[in-house]
Amino acid sequence: MFKTLYARIAIYSITVILFSALISFVLTNVYYHYNLKASNDAKIMKTLKEARQYEQSAKPTHIQQYFKHLGQMNYQIMTIDHKGHKTFYGEPFREDTLSQNAINNVLNNKDYHGIKDKPFALFVTGFFDNVTDNTVGINFKTNDGSIAVFMRPDIGETFSEFRTFLAVLLILLLFISISLVIASTYSIIRPVKKLKLATERLIDGDFETPIKQTRKDEIGTLQYHFNKMRESLGQVDQMRQHFVQNVSHEIKTPLTHIHHLLSELQQTSDKTLRQQYINDIYTITTQLSGLTTELLLLSELDNHQHLLFDDKIQVDQLIKDIIRHEQFAADEKSLIILADLESIDFLGNQRLLHQALSNLLINAIKYTDVGGAIDIALQHSHNNIIFTISNDGSPISPQAEARLFERFYKVSKHDNSNGLGLAITKSIIELHHGTIQFTQSNAYVTTFTITLPNHSH
């Protein structure tokens, strides 16, 4: 029964209503006991004493008729003579609980204040307690001697119509309150159920069907953020599918090539061709190994929570090491590398930053024309570190420029790279809270600019 949010809210609300009614009854009873009981006692005592004055001025034979008249006026009366004989007028009492000591005191001319002195009972309202000790009493003088007269208003008779009205009112109040609780609970739960169904659609892979934002409260905010999450998950799913397709293509193509080369290797006995096939297979497997390494690095960057960025890096020395490592490739194309480096320290991940800067230099060497030049600069600028690397080469179209940092994107179909280098570089720079930009001048000079926050101090 409590497994659904609808049942929980409805039952909790109904419980609150009933508990509030109970507490209200108890507090009302407390209020009567401490604020109204004494004044109620005094009013009834005043009425009884006025009745005694009237009877003392009237004929004594009329006293019984007078008590009957008071009984007809919605009072309950009990009289006791000195012999202990009791006579009741009006509606009967529910129970005779009056003590003999109280009777004797009244017969001895001591007034009795049973209403005021009624002990407090938590769940019994003294005002409605129809027993003989919940009365006021005084002594009446008659021809036959003193009698003790005890009286209280007949609440049941006095408020009979009001009691019916009150009962109907309470029943309607509870019915309407519970109905409204159930209806309001349903109005709250309904969009939550729709969210549940939408979540189930997400689990099944449906990222296209939105949910309508029907409210402006917290649930409406939840609906809005759910749609945003759905769109993000849809984009992630598309990226995942695209990534799988690209990886499959990047692996399938060289594997197909290797399979073809192995077939040719089996069929030929020419030593020169065989050596050429072996060299080609070695080159392709090297590319596959590089692809695997970069895919693992991408996975590491996507799940970067374990990475530390607290290495103290001497950036200028790091760049010099990268240049020295790639100098052979530059010399093969007769390239000149010009470096203007300020001495700068930086806190980050040295392994990753080395990879990012190496990718940029390798790209520059690869796309710079033979005999060209590569310019590298490192400098402070306010609170930032600025690294630029420029080279002249073939122009890049605006369409290609917009997709330059996408995974597996290649500017040329004849490019033998796997299209991951710049994507890896961008991820590394962003993990260091930096930015990377690409610009191209009219003279076909391409420049990559990296901006890093200088928080080394």
From Swiss-Prot:
Residues 246-456 form the Histidine kinase domain. InterPro entries: Bact_Sensor_His_Kinase, HAMP_dom, HATPase_C_sf, His_kinase_dom, HisK_dim/P_dom, HisK_dim/P_sf, Sig_transdc_His_kin-like_C. Residues 186-238 form the HAMP domain. The modification Phosphohistidine is found at residue 249. It is found in: Cell membrane. SUPFAM superfamilies: ATPase domain of HSP90 chaperone/DNA topoisomerase II/histidine kinase, HAMP domain-like, Homodimeric domain of signal transducing histidine kinase. It catalyses: ATP + protein L-histidine = ADP + protein N-phospho-L-histidine. Its EC number is 2.7.13.3. The chain crosses the membrane at residues 9-29, 164-184. The keyword Nucleotide-binding applies. It comes from the Bacteria. PROSITE patterns: HAMP, HIS_KIN. Its main location: membrane. Autophosphorylated. Member of the two-component regulatory system HssS/HssR involved in intracellular heme homeostasis and tempering of staphylococcal virulence. HssS functions as a heme sensor histidine kinase which is autophosphorylated at a histidine residue and transfers its phosphate group to an aspartate residue of HssR. HssR/HssS activates the expression of hrtAB, an efflux pump, in response to extracellular heme, hemin, hemoglobin or blood. This is Heme sensor protein HssS. The lineage of its organism: Bacteria, Bacillati, Bacillota, Bacilli, Bacillales. The gene is hssS.
